């Protein structure tokens, strides 16, 4: 079984089948220079272990198919 996660490595955002061994989807958010006008930068993808957030990052991980939708998009 391989997990399906949303990913921001493609444009527009798409769903990818995670490689073997990467059994978590993650969402990582942080502010860059354009945060006040564009909002937080959002990165989505697959990981083997949930990354440790840096002090300025928010990281969430989950383990079900497509469980990491873009926060501004409705799951679909």
From Swiss-Prot:
Signal sequence coordinates: 1-2
Keyword Electron transport included in the entry's annotation: no
PROSITE patterns: SNAKE_TOXIN (PS00272)
Tissues of expression: Expressed by the venom gland.
Cystine pairs: 5-25, 18-46, 31-35, 50-61, 62-67
UniProt keywords, alphabetically: Acetylcholine receptor inhibiting toxin, Disulfide bond, Ion channel impairing toxin, Neurotoxin, Postsynaptic neurotoxin, Secreted, Signal, Toxin
GO molecular function, one term: ion channel regulator activity
Main location: secreted
Gene3D superfamilies: CD59 (2.10.60.10)
Subcellular location as annotated: Secreted
GO CC annotation: extracellular region
Subunit record text: Monomer in solution, homodimer in crystal state.
Function field: Binds with high affinity to muscular (alpha-1/CHRNA1) and neuronal (alpha-7/CHRNA7) nicotinic acetylcholine receptor (nAChR) and inhibits acetylcholine from binding to the receptor, thereby impairing neuromuscular and neuronal transmission.
Family the entry assigns: Belongs to the three-finger toxin family. Long-chain subfamily. Type II alpha-neurotoxin sub-subfamily.
Listed name of the protein: Alpha-delta-bungarotoxin-4
Biological source species: Bungarus caeruleus (Indian krait)
